[in-house]
Design a protein with these regions (language model features):
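Buried, small/hydrophobic-residue-enriched core segments of structured protein domains
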Residues: 1-197
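C-terminal active-site-proximal or functional interface alpha/beta core segments in diverse enzymes
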Residues: 200
Length: 200
């Protein structure tokens, strides 16, 4: 761990399959310590609950189902726990699960996840950037045989991903994951891509 002014650098060494597991707990810890050390006032529980309920209502009105993926950049364990609890209590059919296995177990919801960015980064290092998405998707389906079928789109930009996410992959995978950028713009691009492939 190194700190230079406000810049923090954390490194792990070892085999990839061992070091990758440090990403989530390290990022969650850094976020929680940041908020503690900078004395930033967090929203009261009632405001957190209201924010979550408002989002649930918006998604429900649009017939959108969603999963919770907030562990890495959460304010704190307590706030994150409150969010997942509220989603479970109020989410109904719109809330389909949580990425955090502990939260999923605690609130008896489905543990759900997608590829990590590192999956495609590994394939880029081994096969080259131009092949990273297509080879990564191919290897994923070889291993999981139809399970864990939500594809991550933004490792090397969504545009590049969709160039390689052809009809075969669009039918093999259950869906795609929005991870960065404007969600409405992403939704429009995704719908347009599926329509271009002749998939309704």
């Amino acid at each position: 761990i190194e700190q230079n002014g406000t810049e923090l650098k954390v490194s792990t060494e070892g085999f990839w399959y061992r070091t990758i597991l440090w990403e989530v707990p390290i990022m969650a810890l850094i976020c929680e310590l940041f908020y503690q050390e900078t004395n930033q006032t967090r929203q009261e529980d009632e405001m957190v609950i209201q924010t979550v309920e408002d989002k649930i209502s918006k998604y429900r009105n649009l017939n959108i189902v969603f999963a919770e993926f907030g562990t890495r950049r959460r304010h704190s364990f307590n706030v994150h726990d409150l969010v997942v609890r509220t989603l479970k209590e109020k989410g109904g059919g719109s809330f389909i699960g949580a990425r955090n296995v502990h939260s999923a177990m605690r609130y008896k919801t489905r543990p759900i996840g997608t590829h990590a960015h590192e999956w495609f980064m590994f394939h880029a290092a081994k096969y080259g950037y131009k092949m990273a998405n297509s080879v990564g998707l191919e290897h994923w389906t070889d291993v999981y045989r139809g399970d864990l079928g939500i594809a991550l789109t933004d490792t090397y930009t969504t545009e590049v991903f969709f160039e390689q996410f052809d009809k075969k992959f669009a039918k093999l995978f259950d869906g795609v994951r929005h991870d960065s950028g404007d969600p409405l713009e992403f939704g429009d691009k995704t719908i347009a891509h599926y329509q271009k492939l002749g998939i309704n």
